[in-house]
Amino acid sequence: MEMASHPAVHPVALPPPYQAVGPPAPPAVRINDFPGSPGTLMGLALRFAQLGFALTALCIMVSIVGFSSVTAFCFLVAAMVLQCIWSLCLGVLDCYALLTKRSLRNSLILSFFVVGDWITSTMTFAGACAAAGITVLIDNDLNQCGPNHCNRFEAAAAMAFMSWVITTISFFLSFWILVTCR
């Protein structure tokens, strides 16, 4: 004798849902509200911090007479200009998203953020390392730090490294959200 299951469904009565008295509970935090993600207040703060450090490094380098005679310093200036433009554009986009209450959690937009952050982060790191290397060469190996503004070079390299750290944080946050978005 063969046993067969029957397709009949037996409904079960459920108790009515619990009705809480008082104000409704706040919505649960979702991944698209993650601090630091594009379109959030923390994401905007990260962009302006990137812009601030990059602009500081750029202003320090430009204020030094004769910085353009060293290729590494010219590369740092070019990288900081690119970082400033990138951070300013994405900061404006974050402001727009915050003001209009729109989400930037689109995989195409997040891919754009990830690739742009990766490129600018790499350029910023390369420029900061090159400037720091030349500064160490001038200071420690050639012992010609007096007439060559080593303190300013060191400050510009330090600001570039800070901009790199914040851009890298932004890159990893955007990449993580892009991966979990799909």
UniProtKB/Swiss-Prot annotation:
Which keywords appear in this protein's UniProt record, sorted alphabetically? Cell membrane, Membrane, Transmembrane, Transmembrane helix
GO terms under cellular component: membrane; plasma membrane
Give its localization.
Answer: Cell membrane
- Tell me where the transmembrane regions lie: 48-68, 73-93, 118-138, 159-179
What InterPro entries does this protein map onto? CASP_dom (IPR006702), CASPL-5 (IPR045009)
Topological domain spans for side Extracellular: 69-72, 139-158
- What ranges are annotated Cytoplasmic (topological domains)? 1-47, 94-117, 180-182
Q: Does the keyword Cell membrane apply?
A: yes
Q: Name one Pfam family in it.
A: CASP_dom
The way it spans or sits in the membrane comes to: Multi-pass membrane protein
| Oligomer and partners | Homodimer and heterodimers.
Per the record, the similarity remark reads: Belongs to the Casparian strip membrane proteins (CASP) family.
Protein known as: CASP-like protein 5A1
Q: What is the lineage of its organism?
A: Eukaryota, Viridiplantae, Streptophyta, Embryophyta, Bryophyta
